[in-house]
Amino acid sequence: MQTCLVVDDSSIVRKIARRILEGLDFQVIEAEDGVDALVVCKKAMPEAVLLDWNMPVMDGYHFLSHLRRMPGGETPRVVFCTTENGIEHISRALEGGANEYIMKPFDKEIIAAKFQEVGLIAVPV
């Protein structure tokens, strides 16, 4: 079973994402900011990260920068999931190492489609 780290300062968003991802057969680990997420990644690198941009302590962009420099940090597929919808944020995220970018609010279909695009879920035949 693949593991997805959900990084968001909102416990409600984490709970919704957990339900969706568990329904897609992912084991889910949660972190409420980038610092907590780095601790998780140092213990065991997940296959996927669903990442918010705006969080206290360390935001998603800075987490991504640290992640990509860690041993094994190039491996996880990172999907930003945020309210930041400007082209400058999207470009910055993708240039910084994100694999995909989705806007909140999200649903199962949106997450499944993006996870298929980055190779985390098989495309139905």
Show where each model-derived region lies.
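Charged docking surfaces used in two-component/phosphorelay signaling
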Residues: K15-G23
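Short hydrophobic/Thr-rich beta-strand motif most characteristic of the beta2 strand and flanking loop
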Residues: D25-E32, V40
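Acidic catalytic/metal-coordinating carboxylates
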Residues: D33-D36, D59-S65
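Active-site beta3 strand of CheY-like receiver
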Residues: A44-L50
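A Lys-centered signature of the CheY-like receiver
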Residues: K104
